[in-house]
Amino acid sequence: MSIPTPYEDLLRDVLANGTHKSDRTGTGTLSVFGRQMRFDLSQSFPLITTKRVHFKSVAVELLWFLRGETNVKWMQDQGVTIWNEWADADGELGPVYGVQWRSWPTPDGGHIDQIAELVENLKSNPDSRRHIVSAWNVAELQDMALPPCHAFFQFYVADGKLSCQLYQRSADTFLGVPFNIASYALLTCMLAQQVGLEPGEFVWTGGDVHIYDNHMDQVLKQLKREPYEYPQLKILRKPDSIFDYTLDDFEVVGYQHHPTIKAPIAV
């Protein structure tokens, strides 16, 4: 039985069908528009195996989002520096993901905690079609160090399982997408535990799906590697709320992977 390779198939798709485009960073990309991948979270945890994905960074960043943070210091204190290139001299990023998830401003001066409302609505009205969180706040885009790439996500409950679909407007397929897959898969598993459901599917939908010109050699190297089975995720305790998880609550079991492949970040 062959191992499913939706991510590697996406890389091949971009290489085969992409159009050369200029981009904001001046790097240049090979790009396709409108692609989708599906991952069955009831069977495994989709941590890409054809190169190493640093799970600690994935988890710390997600916990940082859930804290509603805008400064990189908390992540740096955990040994994670993935946002440093976009922060100002004080470590600030503006009203990025955490603010929009936890404290979306309202016209009357109040704030909406989208994550808290999501959890409550999943419990009280699981069949709703409004289990949505948006980070794309048009009124505050100009104040963000980087407008949201993974901008909008929706949850769906059926047969005792919680599924998630993410819309990612801009997808750095080599560096960013493996991280994003793992992050939203982890969030789905955490939410499922909190609301008494089992993990279902994670559906990744991409808008501008691209490989940067200076990542081509790395992608070709990665695609020569044989994939391994995905690992399993264990959540070691159930905290009082979605906001009370720590890094020590997560264990990835059986993660067999090829070595890291380094590549420059387009800032």
Swiss-Prot record:
Q: Which residues form the active site?
A: C149
Q: Where in the cell is it found?
A: Cytoplasm
Catalyzed reaction equations: dUMP + (6R)-5,10-methylene-5,6,7,8-tetrahydrofolate = 7,8-dihydrofolate + dTMP
Q: Which GO terms describe its molecular function?
A: thymidylate synthase activity
Give the chief site where it resides.
cytoplasm
Any one Pfam family match given in the protein's UniProt record, by short name:
Thymidylat_synt
Q: Per the UniProt record, which EC number(s) apply here?
A: 2.1.1.45
**Chain positions recorded as dUMP binding sites:** R24, R129, R130, R169, S170, A171, D172, N180, H210, I211, Y212
Key words of the record = Cytoplasm, Methyltransferase, Nucleotide biosynthesis, Transferase
Query: Pathway it belongs to?
Result: Pyrimidine metabolism; dTTP biosynthesis
An example of a Gene Ontology cellular component annotation for this protein is: cytosol
Assembly, per entry: Homodimer.
Family per record: Belongs to the thymidylate synthase family. Bacterial-type ThyA subfamily.
* HAMAP family listed in its UniProt record: Thymidy_synth_bact (MF_00008)
Per the entry, what this protein does is: Catalyzes the reductive methylation of 2'-deoxyuridine-5'-monophosphate (dUMP) to 2'-deoxythymidine-5'-monophosphate (dTMP) while utilizing 5,10-methylenetetrahydrofolate (mTHF) as the methyl donor and reductant in the reaction, yielding dihydrofolate (DHF) as a by-product. This enzymatic reaction provides an intracellular de novo source of dTMP, an essential precursor for DNA biosynthesis.
This protein is called what?
Thymidylate synthase
**Can you name the source organism?**
Arthrobacter sp. (strain FB24)
**Name of the coding gene:** thyA
